[in-house]
Amino acid sequence: MEKRLRLAPSPTGLFHIGTARTALFNWLYAQKIGGKFLIRIEDTDFLRSKSEYTKNILEGLKWLGLKWDEEPIKQSDRISIHKSYIKKLLECGAAYRCFTSEDEISELREEQKKKGLPPKHDNRHRSLSKEEIETFISQGRTSVIRFKIDEKIEIKWIDQIRGEIKWQGKDLGGDLVLSRRAKGYEIGDPLYNLAVVVDDNFMNITHVVRGEDHISNTAKQILIYKALNFNLPTFSHTPLILNSEGKKLSKRDCVTSIDEFREMGYLPEALSNYMAFLGWSPKSADREILSLEEISKIFDLSEINKAGAKFSWEKLNWINSQYIKNIESIKLIEIMRKYWDDNGWKPPSEEWANKLAILIRDSMTLLKDSIDQSKPFFLIPTIQKEGQDFLEIRESKLSLKLILNYLIEKNTIKLNKEKAKEIINEISKKHNIKKGILMKSLRVAFFGSLSGPDLIQSWELFAESKTDRTRIERCL
């Protein structure tokens, strides 16, 4: 039997990191067991669902490298099919029309609140006669369709992450609403729990992997599966992603959408690598930097933790920095060039751009760090106070004068790393100036401060862009 998994996001907002991790776990497990990874867009919330969010989700999946195996389906295209199954449940007596008004439901909840009881429908219309139904309809009252839940029943299943889970019928909030309100004998638009079961069955889904916030929904859905004589899939409920305070990660935590991570300068490979270990502790992994292909070979749902997983910016940043260090230079330059173009910076040659990328990559945590790291190579920076103070040292300006005179005198030389070292050594010996003074003086001239990337490699780049002399001259 073919193994089939799915991601079923609701397009009511931007692609969230929680949804992305669920997608990743589904994709990894599908790869591990030789199954298929499918997409279903659950867009039955017509007020909040938007096509731009659907597009955003699909583009986010592509960016993360999570390819699906069949054309995505939209739940909204299958409303008539969902209604036909609600009709079957009505006909077999597993569901009924409920005419309880919104005001009556509010009154019931107020009473329960006063008594300290959880909100729960009292199933008052479960046994209406045909005459009573016709009376309500003639009065113009609208109805929802409710699915009967036996309060004495115990629902249990073996969860691949959590082991055996038990749920009591009495704790499910009363008979389950399957459809929105409608007039007469019409059936309103189907709601989440019914549509999910019908569509998972239609798609032949064998494994459902989703967040732990769906556990109560699973209990309800199992009852619908059984009422419709559908085969039950295997369920797995992943832990929530938590913020630093141990609370569920939300929009209040600033960055939650994949778009935001992308704009901040995270590589998709790094974000996927980090998300894979967010709540999963593999026994067989001997290192933390792994490709999706490598992760899929060792991925095991049973090793996913039950407790919530705290999001760590420090860990994500470290992983991203490792990927930046090891990314192909051509790809890194391509990414950097977008930042350079945005700032109107043009490298003098491809070779120069390649040398710059290699020089600054080890200092980068995020891709956008390339802006600050590249800036002093395109623009001459202002000399900071620490640099100005250092230039007050007599030997500092003398060092720069001697270096400048050497460059003017040897105008025809092509300065490379070896030649740069030779110049420093020669001047140091000839004029009895410490190399440290010479190099710090140059650093101030080039970068405006006493810090920066490798000086010798930087000098080679400044020489190629013909700005090394200009930078030295301004200090004299």
UniProtKB/Swiss-Prot annotation:
Coiled coil: none annotated. CDD domains: GluRS_core. NCBIfam families: gltX_bact. HAMAP family: Glu_tRNA_synth_type1. It is found in: Cytoplasm. One of its GO terms (molecular function) is zinc ion binding. It comes from Prochlorococcus marinus (strain MIT 9301). A motif ('KMSKS' region) lies at residues 248-252. This is Glutamate--tRNA ligase.
